């Protein structure tokens, strides 16, 4: 289980004469058990990407803790093989001068160190699992469409056989039709691989399509946590505002 408990994070102002710290994440707590699919929904600047970096162990919280099976997430040995990530900008995870084969091999070597012949078969199988043929093995990221690149990023994330995958605005730059295809792929992978998701987004519609629990995030705090099935019954003013902006029931 991933636990986020009383997490706080602030950054020092870059202003020369005002060296005070600005709080970005403020006392956030929630849990993501095995089998859960949780969306963190917030507008731009709400602090959700800072929260995602702490969940991934890339940054340590100033206060509170993020743990995986009661072990601190910022320790590589704790999160290794346990959590994958897919970001909005695929260049964050796909090296521009590596082929798809090399991108997947690099992760496989870190995990298992299998012979190349074995990794070749595994890589082709991974691509097929995300809806790409083996013809993509020799392509570079700049030869891929946005949807194809995200499929490769997803293949890279599942390559380590994780229990969890965190998605940080992973589909927001894609066309609507491609977004739906990727969401359907994520639903399929969740079922076939028994994956748990933390899905960080500004898009309520995508969140409700994929996730069974919603966390509404505002100004670095949890405004509301609610089952997807109960969203239309929410009486929280900010949640209603987001719904009215994006959805019509």
Curated annotation (Swiss-Prot):
InterPro entries: AAA+_ATPase (IPR003593), ABC_transp_ATP-bind (IPR050319), ABC_transporter-like_ATP-bd (IPR003439), ABC_transporter-like_CS (IPR017871), P-loop_NTPase (IPR027417). It is found in: Cell membrane. This is Metal-staphylopine import system ATP-binding protein CntF. GO terms for biological process: cobalt ion transport; nickel cation transport; zinc ion transport. It comes from the Bacteria. The keyword Ion transport applies. Nickel/cobalt import is reduced in the presence of zinc. Keywords: ATP-binding, Cell membrane, Cobalt, Cobalt transport, Ion transport, Membrane, Nickel, Nickel transport, Nucleotide-binding, Translocase, Transport, Zinc, Zinc transport. Disruption phenotype: Deletion of the cntABCDF genes decreases nickel and cobalt intracellular levels and decreases virulence. Insertion mutant shows attenuated growth in several infection models. Residues 2-244 form the ABC transporter domain. It comes from Staphylococcus aureus (strain NCTC 8325 / PS 47). GO terms for molecular function: ATP binding; ATP hydrolysis activity. Coiled coil: none annotated. Pfam families: ABC_tran. Induction: Repressed by zinc. SUPFAM superfamilies: P-loop containing nucleoside triphosphate hydrolases. GO terms for cellular component: plasma membrane. Part of the ABC transporter complex CntABCDF (Opp1) involved in the uptake of metal in complex with the metallophore staphylopine (StP). Involved in the import of divalent metals ions such as nickel, cobalt and zinc. Probably responsible for energy coupling to the transport system. Plays a major role in nickel/cobalt import in zinc-depleted conditions. Contributes to virulence. Required for full urease activity in vitro. Belongs to the ABC transporter superfamily. It is a peripheral membrane protein. Its EC number is 7.2.2.-. The gene is cntF. The complex is composed of two ATP-binding proteins (CntD and CntF), two transmembrane proteins (CntB and CntC) and a solute-binding protein (CntA). ATP binds at residues 42-49.
């Amino acid at each position: 289980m991933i636990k986020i408990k009383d997490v706080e994070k602030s950054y020092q102002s870059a202003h020369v004469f005002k060296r005070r710290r600005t709080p970005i994440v403020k006392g956030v707590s929630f849990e993501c058990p095995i089998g859960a699919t949780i969306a963190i929904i917030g507008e731009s600047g709400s602090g959700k990407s800072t929260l995602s970096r702490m969940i991934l162990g890339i940054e340590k919280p100033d206060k509170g803790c993020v743990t995986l099976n009661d072990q601190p997430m910022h320790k590589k040995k704790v999160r290794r093989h346990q959590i994958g990530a897919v970001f909005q900008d695929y260049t964050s995870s796909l090296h521009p001068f590596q082929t798809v084969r090399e991108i997947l091999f690099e992760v496989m070597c870190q995990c298992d160190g299998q012979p190349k012949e074995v990794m070749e078969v595994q890589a082709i199988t991974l691509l097929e699992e995300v809806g790409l043929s083996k013809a993509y093995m020799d392509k570079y990221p700049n030869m891929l469409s946005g949807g194809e690149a995200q499929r490769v990023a997803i293949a890279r994330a599942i390559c380590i056989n994780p229990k969890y995958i965190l998605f940080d605005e992973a589909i927001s730059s894609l066309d609507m039709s491609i977004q739906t295809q990727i969401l359907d792929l994520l639903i399929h992978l969740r079922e076939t691989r028994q994956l748990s998701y933390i899905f960080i987004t500004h898009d309520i519609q995508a969140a409700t399509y994929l996730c069974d629990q919603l966390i509404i995030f505002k100004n670095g705090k949890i405004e509301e946590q609610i089952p997807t099935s109960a969203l239309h019954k929410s009486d929280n003013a900010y949640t209603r505002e987001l719904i009215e902006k994006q959805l019509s029931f």
